[in-house]
From Swiss-Prot:
One Pfam family matching this protein: NTP_transferase
Subunit structure: Homotetramer.
Taxonomic source organism: Vibrio cholerae serotype O1 (strain ATCC 39315 / El Tor Inaba N16961)
Name of the protein described by the UniProt record: Glucose-1-phosphate adenylyltransferase 1
Residues that hold alpha-D-glucose 1-phosphate according to the record: Y96, G161, E176, K177, S194
Protein EC: 2.7.7.27
EC class (word): transferase
GO molecular function: ATP binding; glucose-1-phosphate adenylyltransferase activity
Length: 405
């Protein structure tokens, strides 16, 4: 779409997702067997025919860079690009100080493209959005800034920017992560929260960021500084995410922040519902990613041990012998020896699990080897001595671990 530039913030450290983010940036964390978190934001742009995109990186970005190079290379296509921009440190030897500062330090790239509008989106949420519809709303309202929003239970709203709107969709109030969130009028159990997705008029964006950069009292963040300063002027509008319609999708609106171990695990379990809210199978909204050249998943019975797979996703290159897999997601090249039982678990790929293992409610990162007969997830006190265990009882085994040897 002409006149539009996409900028995806992909520099998140993801401290609440450790140990999954010990060796990679948050947007590079695998999801759903075949994808990385960054893929869902990129698909929202590409499926909306928005093909001029900068991806801004910062922490531990090598695996993200490799994934992008293999799966999202548009080189040779005139006026279409998906380019990774690592932290440049052009404005002093410092990391990005906030989301607004990340864009400010890369304004020169915006000026090179000279767009009319700039779409600034995060990269660590699971959802589908036709961004063209949000753009149409932004232009129709003649807004300087449009923020996408959705309803959230009031008990969870303090984790987000909380919004107030008038009957015309204009923002009339905003608080970033308030301790006592305001509810939607007439709906005391619900709040309207920011999704962290913004569409700016390019001239407005440049002006606001330059002013913010000169303010020594600012934290240089869109939610904490830019939006509170802009909305009283009356040109900030709120786009209702529930009005975004995608062919082949359900009416219900699925959006998940997967910033914690519990939410990451739960979002995987959502994929395994009988009729999931978030579908991987909509041909009208294909989910592009890098798919390595692998054979199909293979299932082999071993004597009296039969393969039994129920409510699970098994990715290419996997080899499963005589084991039971229940309500689990297995990434590329998962190798499961005979007699094992895996339940409600997420295996990120390139994992070898020995014979006779029992694994329950676990997340197993890449390149892990587990010895025969190992039991994980039944005795959490014992597991805490060896692994990371979340407050909700999800066992996480770090990348490259050797367990039981």
């Amino acid at each position: 779409m002409a006149g539009v530039l996409g900028m995806i913030l992909a520099g998140g450290e993801g401290s609440r997702l450790k140990p999954l983010t010990e060796t990679r940036t948050k947007p590079a964390v695998p999801f759903g067997g075949s994808y990385r978190l960054i893929d869902f934001a990129l698909n929202n742009f590409v499926n909306a025919d928005l093909m001029r995109i900068y991806v801004l990186t910062q922490f531990k970005s090598q695996s993200l860079y490799i994934h992008m190079k293999k799966g999202w290379n548009l080189s040779g296509i005139t006026d279409r690009f998906i380019d990774i921009i690592p932290a440049q440190m052009r404005d002093g030897k410092r990391w990005y100080e906030g989301t607004a500062d990340a864009i400010y330090q890369n304004l020169r790239f915006v000026e090179i493209v000279a767009p009319d509008q700039v779409c600034i989106f995060g990269s660590d949420h699971i959802y589908k959005m036709d961004i063209r519809q949000m753009l149409d709303f932004h232009r129709r309202m003649e807004a300087e800034l449009t923020v996408s929003a959705l309803r959230m239970p009031i008990s969870q709203a303090s984790q987000f920017g909380v919004i107030e709107v008038d009957e015309n969709g204009k923002m009339v109030g905003f608080e970033e992560k308030p301790s006592n969130p305001k509810s939607i009028p007439g709906e005391p159990e619900w709040a309207l929260v920011s999704m962290g997705n913004y569409i700016f008029e390019a001239e407005t964006l440049s002006k606001e960021l330059r002013e913010d950069a000169e303010n020594n009292q600012s934290s240089h963040d869109f939610g904490k500084d830019i939006i509170p300063k802009m909305f009283p002027r009356g040109k900030v509008y709120v786009y209702d995410f529930t009005t975004n319609k995608i062919k082949g999708e359900k009416e219900s609106t699925y959006w998940r922040d997967v910033g914690t171990i519990e939410s990451y695990w739960s979002a995987h379990m959502d994929l395994l519902d009988k009729d999931p809210e978030f579908s991987l199978y909509n041909r009208s909204w294909p989910l592009h990613t890098y798919y390595p050249p692998l054979p199909p998943a293979t299932f082999v019975d071993v004597k009296d041990k039969k393969v039994k797979i129920t409510d699970s996703l098994i990715s290419g290159g996997s080899y499963i012998q005589g084991s039971t897999i229940y309500k689990s997601v297995l990434g590329f090249r998962s190798n499961i020896a005979a007699g094992s039982f895996i339940s409600e678990s997420v295996i990120l790929g390139d994992v070898k699990i020995g014979a006779g293992c029992t694994i329950k409610r676990a997340i197993i990162d890449k390149d892990v080897e587990i010895a025969a007969g190992t039991i994980i997830g039944e005795d959490l006190e014992m597991d805490r001595k060896r692994f990371h265990v979340s407050d909700e009882g999800i066992v996480v085994i770090a990348k490259g671990s050797k367990v039981g040897f």
